[in-house]
Each structure stands twice: as C-alpha cells, then as structure tokens.
Amino acid sequence: MSSKYPRSVRCCLPLCALTLEAALTLLFYFFTHYDASLEDQKGLVASYQVGQDLTVMAAIGFGFLTSSFRGHSWSSVAFNLFMLALGVQWAILLDGFLSQFPPGKVVITLFSIRLATMSALSVLISAGAVLGYVNLVQLVVMVLVEVTALGTMRMVISNIFNTDYHMNMMHIYVFAACFGLSVAWCLPKPLAKGTEDKDQTATIPSLSAMLGALFLWMFWPSFNSALLRSPIERKNAVFNTYYAVAVSVVTAISVSSLAHPQGKINMTYMHNAVLAGGVAVATSCHLIPSPWLAMVLGLVAGLISIGGAKCLPGCCNRVLGIHDSSVMHYNFSLLGLLGEIIYIVLLVLDTVGAGNGMVGFQVLVSIGELSLAIVIALTSGLLTGLLLNLKIWKAPHAAKYFDDQVFWKFPHLAVGF
C-alpha cells in the first residue's frame, strides 16, 4: 500500500523551473530583439490596451474562476499565474520560430505578446480539468507540451488552409477542452474514500470564482476581437460578443432559478454560464450581421451550459472515465463546437449570397480545420497524460487531491499529515 504522506517537490520544482527559466532567458538573449520600427502612437496605445485586457482575463479572470474548490483555492489562483507567466514566454519564442523561414531573430512586438497571451490562455482552460490532481512540476510539462501543440496546430492550419490569425486561434476553445480532457482521462480518477467532498465548492471560494467570471465577462469582447485586422470586423466582434454574454447572464440566472425546486439560484452554474455566449460567438463574431442573432446564440449557449451543468456531469464522467470537476466538456468543447457550426452556416450563407460557387469547398475547409485541431489536441493530450503519470514528477497521493496544505505553508494550522 502506498504512503498517504505528500510527495515533496522541494528539489524537483526549483531545479526544473529555474533551469527552464535560465534556458528561456538564454534563448531570448541570443534569438530575440525588440521591434525598432516607429509605430503610430495612437495605434500603440490601442494595441497595449487590448493586450492589457487579455492579461487581466488570464491572470485575474481564469485565476479566480477555478478557485471555487473547497481547500484548493490558493493553489488554483497561484498555479494559474505560474502557468501564464511560463506559457507566455515559451509562446513568444515558439510563434517567432514557427512563423519565419529560414529561422532568424524573433522580433518582439505588442502583437506577438498579445498572441502569446492568447496561446497561454489555452493552458489555463485545459488546466481546469486537472487542477487538484497534479503538482507544479507536472503543470510545467503540461504548459510546454500544450503551447507547442497549439502553436504547431495553428501553423499547420495557416499553411494548409491559408487562414488568418483570428480563425486559427478561435479553435482554442475546442482544442483546450479536448487537450485537458485527454490529459484528465490518463490521470488517476477517483478521490480517496472519505475525501470526496474536497472537490465541492464552498461559499467564500465560490464568490471568488464569481469575481473571476465577472472579469472574464467584462473583457471577453476584447478576446474575441483581439486578432481581427479590419476595423469593421473588430467593431462587429465587440458588439456581438457583448450582446451574447449579456443574454447569457439573463439566461443563466433565470434558468438556474427555474431548475431548482424552490426557485433558488445556483452560484456554481453561474460561474461558467454567464460566459457561454462569448464562447459560442467567438468564431463567427465578426460575421454576425445583426444583434438579434448574437442574442439568440447567447440564449442557446446559456441553456446548454446550465443544462450541461445540471444533467451531464455524472453521465459524462462515468462514460468518458474522467472526473471533470471544472466542467470543461460542456462549457468549452460543446459551446466551441456550437460556435464552429454557426460559423460554417454563416460562411455558407455569405458565400451563396455573394454568388460564389465554392460553397462545398468552404465547408470542407472549415470541417478540415476543426478536425485537425481536435486530432492534434487529443493526440498531444493523451501523450501528455501518459507523460504526467511517470513517477519522477512526484504527483500528489490520491488522499491529498484538492488540498492546499500539500503545497502551501499555513502558519495558523498544524501540519496534519
């Protein structure tokens, strides 16, 4: 019988993290330089503001969104920040190396930092499926593999299907959810006997998670419009995302009350349902011609999110063989697929309306992009999950899942192990 005492990462974590940081520093020293061009000052400020919005979404929004677990709130917030900081550095280098041939010095611009932040967001979404089961060393491995897989997927899609930055990045929801669920499928699933309540939410952490959801709700229009080049497309993306998430809020509160026998609102449902519209319109936000369509999508997405939260967890966890505490499947993969379908429909209508006979080709291209993203996500996720199962990472014992005391010093508490 294995010991229930926590496995210390005192030597493993500093050695791994600091060695990696030193390697990244050397890579930045030899292979990068800042953009020396004279950019329009107004454009520079606008670009920085969008990047700032994305950083707030990543650090505060996703950081607090996963902090609702009883006994695991500290780790959720801090580990997300750690993954973000590491992921952005690696994504800047990777995007630079993959985007130029022959290889040369990587030019760092505000746009490249924005792109890297969005790539790192993929890891934060995926990590929701494994937080509580893994330690920081395992998360370091997950960050490196997922950012590499996402960057490779984007490069392949861009070269094969000739898509722009916005389109190949908006596969991020489906990609991140499939990657995270694949990793979770490979990890030990059941909580130890007597510790099943550790992945349940508590009142104060749940309020913190709602704070994260509010930050995401405010800045989601910036995320959906960040990579669009045309001012008209950016404007449409901002407007449509705002309408969609606004309707999602009304739907989430109303349907949550309707679903409870006594008409009470479930805060757990609220965390993700208020964001459902933003995920659903992400791919097609610049193509939606009218506010009412974005509002309908927000309504449908909110219904799917609430319905999934109420009906699917037990069924999906049992069928898929995972323990998806952060409900990744129906909050990102299902809504991401809905968004992809809506994009294909709008693209077909736009192509037919323009008298273009390439409708079938456009549909095949869109389906090909989505299929490739899913295949790469599932394959790389399975490989990552198998890699994280190696004993060298000193994974937490099942009895210490969702337990902050494994990783943090609590001066007012006894050790208790």
From Swiss-Prot:
Taxonomy, superkingdom: Eukaryota
Q: Where found, per UniProt?
A: Membrane
Keyword entries, A-Z: Membrane, Transmembrane, Transmembrane helix
What's the short name of a Pfam family annotated to this entry? Answer: Ammonium_transp
InterPro entries xref list: Ammonium/urea_transptr, NH4_transpt_AmtB-like_dom, RhesusRHD
Instruction: Describe its membrane topology.
Output: Multi-pass membrane protein
Kindly list the biological process annotations in GO that this record carries.
Answer: ammonium homeostasis; ammonium transmembrane transport
Membrane-spanning segments: 12-32, 44-64, 77-97, 125-145, 172-192, 203-223, 238-258, 265-285, 287-307, 331-351, 358-378
Return the GO cellular component terms, semicolon-separated: plasma membrane
Q: Which GO terms describe its molecular function?
A: ammonium channel activity
Q: Which family does it belong to?
A: Belongs to the ammonium transporter (TC 2.A.49) family. Rh subfamily.
Q: Can you name this protein?
A: RH-like protein ID
Q: Which organism is it from?
A: Gorilla gorilla gorilla (Western lowland gorilla)
Traced from the root, the source organism's taxonomic lineage reads: Eukaryota, Metazoa, Chordata, Craniata, Vertebrata
